[in-house]
C-alpha cells in the first residue's frame, strides 16, 4: 500500500522474518562517522533484545510485532498501481483503494535501515542466528512482518542522511514508555499487576 505525507512517500509491505533479519540494517549504519556509529549502536539494549524480547518471540504462540519503520536508500524505487475491477465496488471505495494498492520494486541495489523498531529487529536477528539462544519456534523464519518503507525525493546523499536522521530522532524522541498505571490495567503476564488490578476492582 502506498501513501503520502508531507515530504515523504511511504509504503506498507510485508517481509518474511528471515528477509528482515538479512536485509534490514540498523540506524547506526547510516552514519559516516565511526565514532557516531558506535555511539548509536550502543543505544541498542542488547540484553533486552536478546533476553526479554527473544524469550517473548520464542515462547509465545500469540506473538506479534508492530510495524518496523525502515529507511530505503538507493535501488531506484518504482511504484506501480495494480489494476482493479471497478465493477467490484460494493462499498463505493474503488477510487481510494485503486490509488493505494500497487507494487513497489527496487533494482537490487537498495539498502534498508531501521528507524523505529531497532530492538524488535535485533531480537529477530538474534533469534534466527544459529549460534545464539533461544532457538526460534518451528516456522518462525517464514512468518510475516509488517514493514513501513520510507522514501524521500532528495537525491543528494547529504540531504538524504539529514532528512532520515531527523526522522529517526523525531520517532525516538517522542516515544513514551507504558506508565505503571496502564501496565496494571492492561498487563496479562505480570502476576503482580494482575493481582493489583483485581484488588482495585473489588475495593
Walk through the language-model features, giving the residues of each.
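Basic- and aromatic-enriched surface patches that contact anionic nucleotides/nucleic acids
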Residues: 64, 70, 74-75, 81-203
